[in-house]
């Protein structure tokens, strides 16, 4: 299936009326022919913004781009919003808004919010103006045809119901997790806590915990239920109760990575210095400044010794605890996280009858040590090996395709379907069981615009992580010893 086959001769969707943020609908789902919807349709046709209402100020892109600090101004659907006073209350964290300041955030906005009609209510008080007549609907340096084609692709995915989740799929994964958790306890109850039993239940709990990581990822991206509140409930239960980690901290951190993948210093996933130097520019920067906290020429060995075993029990656990107990913003949500996480430890104390408190804590961290390499390989194989740069303010499609790659998987559940990383980054709220359906359309669109759609074997992707670390180390050494 190709992208062009899903479009009509004029590039529009065949047999479907597009809807846009803020468009009203009649009871049967048909759009009301109001002025705002018609105006937006015309804007999309010519790629420029129409005459704004007289009550609103007019802005040029040059003026907006000056407000690119500390969540100042951003543009959504040709409208200009000042979010500086509201950023700290943003459910996705203030940093996401900081990263989009002074930019067209339309595609980001749509990608991260499944219930656009509700989010529009929060935007109304923040509206300060519109783009001036004649200004393009996105920054001038962006490819307007590419932006339009991706919007068409999004509408195609909606028309094919690719954003509708199969609840049975996620229910079976949830039941599998609970069965493994209960089975582990029953085995200890019947057979005691000897070493063979302990290692076997650790294996079961590792599968359960890894599956929980993937399920909380689904719920955190609001891709299970149509109503966000039910996704939040499932996310709290799985992330906090089953994994003992802060759901809110994960949201803030992970959404930054989605909005600005592989972009220094906005993507926290590549902010690993001084322990690891990633990409091409960061190692050279450290080398020229003669910075040597560790022997970076052996950082690929530290990947095996440090990153693989300590990612879950240390790298994720400590910042999660810090977010819950030390950070003052979003206090009410931190208290919710603390309550949920407390239930994780109470639940695990049921093993204390057989292992004691200290033995139970060792069991918890043994499982996290075993889970950690699994999650590291799955999450890092799609990003560390790809292009890293400072902010270049590219369009959504180009940003995501340059920073991510797909891997061939014989068993998608092993990776939580994250082997379709490109599709996941382009459509964060799409249920993962639909990634394979939209992948051919994405591949076709990338080919049309000359973007390299990377899809590699999984074992090669694993090896590329180490090869990327060695390459960065060599760049550091060249700059350090010159």
From Swiss-Prot:
Chain ranges for the short sequence motif Histidine box-1 as given in the UniProt record: 217-221
CDD domains found in the cross-reference section: Delta6-FADS-like (cd03506)
Key words, A-Z: Electron transport, Endoplasmic reticulum, Fatty acid biosynthesis, Fatty acid metabolism, Heme, Iron, Lipid biosynthesis, Lipid metabolism, Membrane, Metal-binding, Oxidoreductase, Transmembrane, Transmembrane helix, Transport
Membrane topology: Multi-pass membrane protein
Taxonomic superkingdom: Eukaryota
UniProt record, GO biological process: lipid metabolic process; unsaturated fatty acid biosynthetic process
Gene Ontology CC entries for this record: endoplasmic reticulum membrane
Lumenal side: 189-190, 327-343
Protein name, entry field: Putative fatty acid desaturase 2-like protein FADS2B
Origin species: Homo sapiens
Primary gene name: FADS2B
């Amino acid at each position: 299936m190709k992208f062009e086959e899903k479009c009509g001769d004029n590039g529009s969707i065949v047999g479907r009326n597009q809807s846009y943020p803020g468009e009203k609908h009649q009871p049967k789902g048909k759009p009301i022919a109001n002025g705002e919807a018609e105006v937006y349709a015309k804007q999309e046709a010519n790629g420029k913004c129409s005459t704004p209402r007289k009550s609103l100020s007019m802005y040029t892109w040059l003026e907006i781009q000056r407000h690119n600090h500390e969540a100042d101004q951003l543009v959504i659907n040709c409208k200009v919003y000042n979010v500086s006073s509201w950023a700290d209350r943003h459910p996705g964290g203030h940093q996401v808004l900081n990263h989009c300041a002074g930019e067209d955030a339309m595609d980001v906005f749509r990608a991260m919010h499944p219930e656009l009609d509700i989010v529009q209510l929060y935007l109304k008080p923040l509206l300060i103006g519109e783009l001036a007549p004649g200004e393009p609907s996105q920054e001038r340096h962006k490819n307007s045809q590419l932006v339009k084609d991706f919007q068409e692709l999004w509408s195609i995915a909606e028309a094919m119901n690719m954003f509708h989740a199969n609840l049975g799929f996620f229910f079976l994964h949830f039941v599998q997790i609970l069965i493994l958790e209960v089975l582990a306890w029953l085995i200890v109850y019947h057979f005691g806590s000897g070493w063979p039993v302990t290692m076997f239940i650790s294996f079961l709990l590792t599968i359960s915990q890894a599956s929980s990581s993937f399920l909380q990822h689904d719920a955190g991206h609001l891709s299970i239920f149509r109503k966000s509140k039910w996704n939040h409930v499932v996310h709290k239960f799985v992330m906090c109760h089953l994994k003992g980690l802060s759901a809110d901290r994960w949201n803030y951190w992970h959404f930054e990575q989605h909005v600005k993948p592989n972009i220094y210093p906005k993507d926290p996933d590549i902010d690993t210095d001084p322990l690891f130097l990633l990409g091409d520019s960061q190692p050279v920067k450290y080398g020229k400044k003669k910075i040597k906290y560790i022997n970076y020429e052996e950082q690929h060995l530290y990947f095996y010794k440090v990153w693989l075993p300590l990612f879950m029990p240390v790298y994720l656990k400590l910042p999660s605890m810090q977010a819950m107990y030390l950070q003052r913003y979003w206090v009410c949500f931190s208290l919710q996280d603390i309550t949920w996480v407390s239930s994780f430890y109470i639940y695990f104390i049921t093993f204390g009858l057989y292992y004691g408190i200290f033995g139970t804590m060792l069991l918890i961290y043994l499982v996290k040590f075993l889970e950690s390499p699994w999650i590291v390989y799955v999450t890092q194989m799609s990003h560390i090996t790809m292009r890293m740069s400072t902010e270049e303010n590219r369009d959504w499609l180009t940003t995501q395709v340059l920073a991510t790659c797909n891997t061939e998987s014989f068993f998608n559940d092993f990776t939580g379907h994250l082997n379709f990383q490109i599709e996941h980054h382009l459509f964060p709220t799409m249920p993962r069981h639909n990634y394979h359906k939209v992948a051919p359309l994405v591949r076709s669109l990338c080919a049309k615009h000359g973007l390299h759609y990377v899809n590699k074997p999984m074992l090669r992707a694993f090896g590329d992580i180490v090869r990327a670390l060695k390459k960065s180390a060599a760049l550091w050494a060249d700059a350090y010893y010159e």
